[in-house]
C-alpha cells in the first residue's frame, strides 16, 4: 500500500462535482430555451401574444410587388396582409409601373395581356433576381396565346391546386368557436331551383343539361334574356331557393368557381354541380355538401331526387350538417396578392416555368 494514499486531498473531486453540476444547469437552461423558441416558431398565423420584449432580430426589408395591370383593368382595394391574416408578413403592393426596376416580383394577369402577350409583358432587361408570376383564374379555353409565354415566368398562380400559388375561388374553414349563424329557416325557402347565367351558349354542356332537366322540373333562370336580377338583390333572391344549379361554363380540374362558393353557398342553397368529377369536388367540400349531376343516370332522375328532397325536410337538412363545423369563404383579389407576398417570403430558389401551355392545357 502506498503510505501517501491516505493523505491524498479530496478537493479535486469536489471541483469535478461542482463542474458537473454547473454543466447540468447550463444544459437545463439551454434545452428550456430551445423549447420556448420552438413554441414561438410553430408557424401559427396568430401574432405572438403579449410580446412586449424587443426583438433583436434584424428587420427584413419589406418586399415590393408590382401588379403589371389591375385585374381586368379595374382597380381593387388592397389591404395590409398582416391585417388579413394576423401575424403574417407584409409586402408593399402597387400598380405603379415606375417602381418596376426596384420590384422584387411582378404579377401578370393573363386576361389583360393575352391579346398580344409579348408586347404587354414587362420590359426588358428584367432586373436581376426579379420574379414574374403568371396569374390566371380562367379555364384553358379562355386563355389564348399561352405558347408565347415560354420561359418568361418563374411561378404560377391560379385556381389549379398544383399551382405554385394556389388561389381558389373559395374554400371551407373551421369555425373558431360556436357557429355564428342561426339554423336554416326552412320557411324562407319558398322556391325550388334557381340558376343565374350570364354567358348563355346553346351548344354548351350546361345549357344542354338544363334544357333536359327543365322538361321534368321547373327551374327559374336569371340573367340576359331571362328573369331580371337587379344589382344588389342577387343574394336576397337566390336565398329563397332550396337548390342552385352551380353549372360551370368549362369542365376542367379544380375549376370550381363563384357559382358554387358565392351563388349557392352564400345563399344557403344546396348546390347542384356540373363541372369536374365528384372526387375533384370532394377535395374541397364534404361529400354531403352538394349534389353532383353525375350521381344520376339522367336529368329526369335528378329532377325526381330534388322533388323528393323538397318533401323530406330531414333529408334536405342533412345537406347543411357540415355547417356546424365549417364555413364557406370566397376569394378576394387582395388576399390572392398577399398569398404571392407570403410565397415570396418563403421561396428562396429561382426557377423558370418552361411552358405555361404544356402545364395548363
Swiss-Prot record:
Keywords: Blood group antigen, Glycoprotein, Glycosyltransferase, Golgi apparatus, Lipid metabolism, Membrane, Signal-anchor, Transferase, Transmembrane, Transmembrane helix. It comes from Homo sapiens (Human). Residues 39-58 are annotated as: Disordered. GO terms for molecular function: 3-galactosyl-N-acetylglucosaminide 4-alpha-L-fucosyltransferase activity; 4-galactosyl-N-acetylglucosaminide 3-alpha-L-fucosyltransferase activity; alpha-(1->3)-fucosyltransferase activity; fucosyltransferase activity. InterPro entries: Glyco_tran_10_C (IPR055270), Glyco_tran_10_N (IPR031481), Glyco_trans_10 (IPR001503), GT10-like_C_sf (IPR038577). It holds the Pfam family Glyco_tran_10_N. It catalyses: a beta-D-galactosyl-(1->3)-N-acetyl-beta-D-glucosaminyl derivative + GDP-beta-L-fucose = a beta-D-galactosyl-(1->3)-[alpha-L-fucosyl-(1->4)]-N-acetyl-beta-D-glucosaminyl derivative + GDP + H(+); an N-acetyl-alpha-neuraminyl-(2->3)-beta-D-galactosyl-(1->4)-N-acetyl-beta-D-glucosaminyl derivative + GDP-beta-L-fucose = an alpha-Neu5Ac-(2->3)-beta-D-Gal-(1->4)-[alpha-L-Fuc-(1->3)]-beta-D-GlcNAc derivative + GDP + H(+); a beta-D-galactosyl-(1->4)-N-acetyl-beta-D-glucosaminyl derivative + GDP-beta-L-fucose = a beta-D-galactosyl-(1->4)-[alpha-L-fucosyl-(1->3)]-N-acetyl-beta-D-glucosaminyl derivative + GDP + H(+); an alpha-Neu5Ac-(2->3)-beta-D-Gal-(1->4)-beta-D-GlcNAc-(1->3)-beta-D-Gal-(1->4)-[alpha-L-Fuc-(1->3)]-beta-D-GlcNAc derivative + GDP-beta-L-fucose = an alpha-Neu5Ac-(2->3)-beta-D-Gal-(1->4)-[alpha-L-Fuc-(1->3)]-beta-D-GlcNAc-(1->3)-beta-D-Gal-(1->4)-[alpha-L-Fuc-(1->3)]-beta-D-GlcNAc derivative + GDP + H(+). It is a single-pass type II membrane protein. Glycans are attached at residues 154, 185. This is 3-galactosyl-N-acetylglucosaminide 4-alpha-L-fucosyltransferase FUT3. One of its GO terms (biological process) is ceramide metabolic process. Residues 35-361 are lumenal. It is found in: Golgi apparatus, Golgi stack membrane. Residues 1-15 are cytoplasmic.
Amino acid at each position: 500500500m502506498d503510505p501517501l494514499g491516505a493523505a491524498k486531498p479530496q478537493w479535486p473531486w469536489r471541483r469535478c462535482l461542482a463542474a458537473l453540476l454547473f454543466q447540468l444547469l447550463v444544459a437545463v437552461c439551454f434545452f428550456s430555451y430551445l423549447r420556448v423558441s420552438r413554441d414561438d416558431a410553430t408557424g401559427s398565423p396568430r401574432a405572438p401574444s403579449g410580446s412586449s420584449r424587443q426583438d433583436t432580430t434584424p428587420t427584413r426589408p419589406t418586399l415590393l410587388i408590382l401588379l403589371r395591370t389591375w385585374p381586368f383593368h379595374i382597380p381593387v382595394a388592397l389591404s395590409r396582409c398582416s391585417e388579413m391574416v394576423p401575424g403574417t408578413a407584409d409586402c408593399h403592393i402597387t400598380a405603379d409601373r415606375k417602381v418596376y426596376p426596384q420590384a422584387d416580383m411582378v404579377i401578370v394577369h393573363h386576361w389583360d395581356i393575352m391579346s398580344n402577350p409579348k408586347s404587354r409583358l414587362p420590359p426588358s432587361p428584367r432586373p436581376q433576381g426579379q420574379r414574374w408570376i403568371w396569374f390566371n383564374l380562367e379555364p384553358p379555353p379562355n386563355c389564348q396565346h399561352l405558347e408565347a409565354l415560354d420561359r418568361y415566368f418563374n411561378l404560377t398562380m391560379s385556381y389549379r391546386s398544383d399551382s405554385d400559388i394556389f388561389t381558389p375561388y373559395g374554400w371551407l374553414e373551421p369555425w373558431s368557436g360556436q357557429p355564428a349563424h342561426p339554423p336554416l329557416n326552412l320557411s324562407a325557402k319558398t322556391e325550388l331551383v334557381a340558376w343565374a347565367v350570364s354567358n348563355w351558349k346553346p351548344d354548351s354542356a350546361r345549357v344542354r343539361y338544363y334544357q333536359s332537366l327543365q322538361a321534368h322540373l321547373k327551374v327559374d333562370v336569371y340573367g340576359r334574356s331571362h328573369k331580371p336580377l337587379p344589382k344588389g338583390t342577387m343574394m336576397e333572391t337566390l336565398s329563397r331557393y332550396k337548390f342552385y344549379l352551380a353549372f360551370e361554363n368549362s369542365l376542367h380540374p379544380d375549376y370550381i368557381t363563384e357559382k358554387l362558393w358565392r351563388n349557392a353557398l352564400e345563399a344557403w342553397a344546396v348546390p347542384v354541380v356540373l363541372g369536374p368529377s365528384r372526387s375533384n369536388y370532394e377535395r374541397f367540400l364534404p361529400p354531403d355538401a352538394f349534389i353532383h349531376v353525375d350521381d344520376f343516370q339522367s336529368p329526369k332522375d335528378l329532377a325526381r331526387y330534388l322533388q323528393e328532397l323538397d318533401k323530406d325536410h330531414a333529408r334536405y337538412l342533412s345537406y347543411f350538417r357540415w355547417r356546424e363545423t365549417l364555413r364557406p369563404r370566397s376569394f378576394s383579389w387582395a388576399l390572392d396578392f398577399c398569398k404571392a407576398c407570403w410565397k415570396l417570403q418563403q421561396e428562396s430558389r429561382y426557377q423558370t416555368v418552361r411552358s405555361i401551355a404544356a402545364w395548363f392545357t
